[in-house]
UniProtKB/Swiss-Prot annotation:
Name of the protein described by the UniProt record: Hps1-dma1 cluster transcription factor tfc7
UniProtKB keywords: DNA-binding, Metal-binding, Nucleus, Transcription, Transcription regulation, Zinc
Biased composition (Polar residues): 50-59, 67-80
Compartment(s) of residence: Nucleus
Cysteines engaged in disulfide bonds, as pairs: none
Domain of life: Eukaryota
Keyword DNA-binding attached: yes
Gene that encodes the chain: tfc7
DNA-binding feature ranges: 10-37
Organism: Dothistroma septosporum (strain NZE10 / CBS 128990) (Red band needle blight fungus)
PROSITE patterns referenced in this protein's UniProt entry, alphabetically: ZN2_CY6_FUNGAL_1, ZN2_CY6_FUNGAL_2
Alphabetized PANTHER family for the sequence: MONODICTYPHENONE CLUSTER TRANSCRIPTION FACTOR-RELATED, OLEATE-ACTIVATED TRANSCRIPTION FACTOR 1-RELATED
Length: 381
């Protein structure tokens, strides 16, 4: 007769998947819990069973605690509440108790097309509408969610459980917070930004008039800019003067001075191109110093090279047109910075601007009259 083999772990450790200490008659876990330690027979006599009967037998060997059967109470007994139960305050209402003869509520079949709109809402927007008091189709089934404090019976509560006043949640206080505009970043005002741009444009224009590229060799041995380079640079400078005098930005004391200096430098370069010497630009000792010198060269229109007389006629017309445009900008400058619109006394800055613009106007008018006289006489130079 073969010896009966028992399992290596007790039934409790095997059922809970815990390693057993395999002590007899009680393992450490059963001794700590005060349970009876029981070792079942080992089923490993041969190959393990392929069916699920072995698993069912393991589960059946586990001890089952006794279960108390509680009788099912009728619906009326569940709805009734003992008198000694305290009534705790709540912000949600208690639904009315159903009558014994009330019919059990059945949810409607959503697949049925004949379902009434009162039992199944057709519109699902009520789920996302947080401000409406009741949803369409559920107003008759859902009671109001606001219970006032006077309808609740007074109760004596412990200090450990404070009672908060029951009141409805009003979203009107949060509407102002939601409608607030987003905070705008701290950026400089447009007038200050435009003023910086105008100062940069005036400085760059004046530098271009002083640092004109000198690539051609003059008869004196020095290098100077050519006629076409001078005409191109001065045309861009006249356009910059128009932008500066028409800008409505806030200008400091020195920016108007810089603008009128740029205008005077443009007139000096055009006089050098047209070979016009202004007698009013000399020094007290009668000497004149001209820094604006250009190198004469033939003018080309594409592949066609103009002769000397036609080239001078074209240069006079180009210079006269640009000086007339510059004269318009100087007049705008005079009205804006040198004349007092209120009729009062002119400030010191206005007097300074008026003296500077007066000098530029006299030089500009002298050059324009000289060019117009050349064109009328038919002698280009």
């Amino acid at each position: 007769m073969s010896t009966i083999k028992y399992r290596a772990a007790c039934d409790h450790c095997s059922a809970t998947k815990i390693k057993c200490t395999q002590e007899r008659p009680q393992c450490t876990r059963c001794r700590a819990l005060g349970r009876d330690c029981h070792y079942s027979r080992s089923l490993r006599a041969g190959k393990p069973p392929r069916s699920s009967q072995g698993l069912n037998r393991k589960i059946s060997n586990a001890p089952v605690l006794p279960r108390q059967n509680t009788p099912v109470s009728n619906p009326t007994s569940m709805s009734s509440k003992p008198e000694h139960w305290p009534t705790m305050p709540t912000s949600y209402p208690t639904p009315q108790a159903a009558a014994p003869t009330a019919e059990i509520f059945h949810f409607p079949d959503l697949s049925s097309a004949a379902t009434s709109s009162s039992s199944s809402p057709a519109n699902t927007d009520w789920f996302f509408d947080f401000n409406s008091g009741s949803a369409d189709g559920l107003g008759d089934l859902t009671p109001p969610l606001v219970v006032t404090a006077p309808h609740l019976p007074p109760l004596d509560h412990d200090l450990k459980h404070p009672v908060f006043p029951t009141q409805g949640i009003h979203f009107g206080a949060f509407a102002d917070l939601i409608s607030l505009p987003p905070a705008s970043p701290l950026l400089p005002s447009p007038s200050l930004a435009d003023g910086d741009r105008c100062a940069k444009l005036a400085t760059e224009t004046l530098n271009s008039l002083y640092d004109m590229p000198a690539n051609h060799l003059h008869g004196s041995g020095n290098r100077h800019p050519s006629v076409d380079q001078t005409l191109s640079t001065c045309a861009r400078a006249v356009q910059a003067i128009h932008e500066l005098v028409n800008c409505s930005c806030q200008k400091d004391l020195y920016l108007p001075m810089l603008i009128i200096i740029v205008a005077s430098k443009i007139v000096a370069w055009y006089q050098a191109v047209a070979y016009i010497r202004d007698p009013g630009t000399g020094f007290a000792d009668g000497k004149q110093c001209f820094r604006e010198v250009v190198v004469e060269g033939p003018l080309n229109i594409g592949a066609y090279q103009l002769d000397d007389e036609v080239g001078w006629t074209l240069k006079n017309q180009i210079v006269l047109g640009q000086l007339q445009r510059l004269n318009e900008a100087v007049n705008i400058y005079d009205r804006r910075y040198c004349s007092d619109s209120l009729g009062g006394q002119m400030t010191e800055g206005g007097k300074l601007y008026a003296s500077m613009v007066g000098f530029v106007k006299s030089t500009l008018q002298f050059t324009i009259h000289a060019l117009e006289g050349r064109i009328r006489s038919g002698h280009p130079r």
